[in-house]
């Protein structure tokens, strides 16, 4: 997902670039830590390992744009599936069963 259609950037700390993004990329030697299929190895993005707003270093990893895009897309699909499942009515128990 591109930043253009996302409100996610507003949730990042004001000092994201200087105190989060650059140190994470530098610590990884600017190499993608996801290393998935199609990886271009040159890290340009910082990914939250677990979804949410935990910006601790242990929850951040360097990622190339290809791996980051694929991971974010997969997480989005999983989240939509989870929300859709919550809308479904749970199956009713048979009245004769205890």
Swiss-Prot record:
Region of interest (Disordered), ranges: 75-98
HNH domain mapped to chain residues: 38-73
Biased composition regions of type Basic residues, renumbered to the chain: 81-98
InterPro entries tied to this protein: HNH, HNH_nuc
GO molecular function: endonuclease activity; nucleic acid binding; zinc ion binding
Domain of life the protein comes from: Viruses
Pfam family, one: HNH
Residues forming coiled coils: none
Name this polypeptide is given: Gene 4 protein
Organism of this sequence: Mycobacterium phage L5 (Mycobacteriophage L5)
Organism lineage string: Viruses, Duplodnaviria, Heunggongvirae, Uroviricota, Caudoviricetes
């Amino acid at each position: 997902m591109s930043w253009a259609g996302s409100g996610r950037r507003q949730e990042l700390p004001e000092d994201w670039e200087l105190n989060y993004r650059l140190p994470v990329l530098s610590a990884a030697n600017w190499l993608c830590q996801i290393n998935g299929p199609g990886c271009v190895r040159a890290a340009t993005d910082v990914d939250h390992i677990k979804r949410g707003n935990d910006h601790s270093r242990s929850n951040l990893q360097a990622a190339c744009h290809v791996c980051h895009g694929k991971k974010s897309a997969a997480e989005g699909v999983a989240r939509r599936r989870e929300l859709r499942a919550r809308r479904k009515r749970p199956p009713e128990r048979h009245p004769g069963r205890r």
